[in-house]
Amino acid sequence: MRPYLLLTPGPLTTSESVKTAMMTDWCTWDEDYNVHIVEEIRKGLVQLATRKTDEYTSILMQGSGTYCVEATLGSVITPKHKLLILSNGAYGDRMGNIAEYHEMNYDMLAFDETEQVSVEYVDDYLAHNAEITHVAVVHCETTTGILNPLKEIAHMVKMHGKKLIVDAMSSFGGVPLDVEELGIDFMISSANKCIQGVPGFGFIIARKSELQYCKGVSKSLSLDIYDQWDAMEKGHGKWRFTSPTHVVRAFKQAMDELAAEGGVEARHARYCRNHDVLVEGMRSLGFKTLLKDEVQSPVITSFLYPDKEFDFKEFYHQLKEKGFVIYPGKISQADTFRIGNIGDVFPEDFSRLIEAIKTVAK
């Protein structure tokens, strides 16, 4: 029995069957786990990411999505490289923090949190800064819910002959994309987002030809994506260090449920319906969205406080008592709160949410 729905961008509400999948113990040395679960996940992730499956591989890494972002940047960027980070929110900024810690040679182009990354500006920057070798960008910036124009960014980056690293943490599995068609070299995501698993590991979809250059680059033992991949390849799914077995098994169940739903296109359509029901209902109650509709993702939606007297903590706790957990805002330029549209939640859940907000907001 669910005490409440998590209307958050991850961790999120999971199905009962995903939770039940964690009720069995697994041996990390056994082929039932490594071959029939881990390797099936690795293969399935590549199939979700592209039709050109022979050109890409996947690496699973223990920890949160940020662990995978740091592992990727730390395994890809050498002292001979120069990284350009495109940021319009907290998660783009976090890549900058990682680059600082690793003393990488990098530049950052910062854009307003409520505006998409400007393709024209980045194009001009790359045209005048030939020393840039890699570009990193967040696809869906959950700071606000904005969806960056990945197709246009990727085309422009490839036109300039640069390598592309994409943080698709909150979009992969819920927003259609093909890494090969877009020319993405490394794409990063996490178990507890649109594929609707639980927290505990993330993953990288890597172009095989680029991954080979990562050997010996990382200065970290545990956050080395090449060594992790090499161990999984040679060990048929065996992780270098203890893997989160229950989380991995739950993720396999979540992937099966994604396929049963009809794949990424069908899930994207459900998330869009969730978002539409939410926004229509909230606007009918007088709430305003932070972002323009044309740049809004279906993943998470930011709403402005209705007035100066609005008490988010009180609003939050009253909604929680009615069975809904939402998210505080994360930007400095406006008072906002956020409601996630992803997870094992459906349009009828958002209709119930609107009814709850109608009583709470009186």
Curated annotation (Swiss-Prot):
It catalyses: (2-aminoethyl)phosphonate + pyruvate = phosphonoacetaldehyde + L-alanine. The modification N6-(pyridoxal phosphate)lysine is found at residue 193. GO terms for biological process: organic phosphonate catabolic process. GO terms for molecular function: 2-aminoethylphosphonate-pyruvate transaminase activity. It comes from the Bacteria. Its cofactor is pyridoxal 5'-phosphate. Its EC number is 2.6.1.37. Keywords: Aminotransferase, Pyridoxal phosphate, Pyruvate, Transferase. It is an enzyme of class 2 (transferase). InterPro entries: Aminotrans_V_dom, NH2EtPonate_pyrv_transaminase, PyrdxlP-dep_Trfase, PyrdxlP-dep_Trfase_major, PyrdxlP-dep_Trfase_small, SP_NH2Trfase/AEP_transaminase. The keyword Secreted does not apply. Coiled coil: none annotated. Belongs to the class-V pyridoxal-phosphate-dependent aminotransferase family. PhnW subfamily. Homodimer. Involved in phosphonate degradation. This is 2-aminoethylphosphonate--pyruvate transaminase. The gene is phnW.
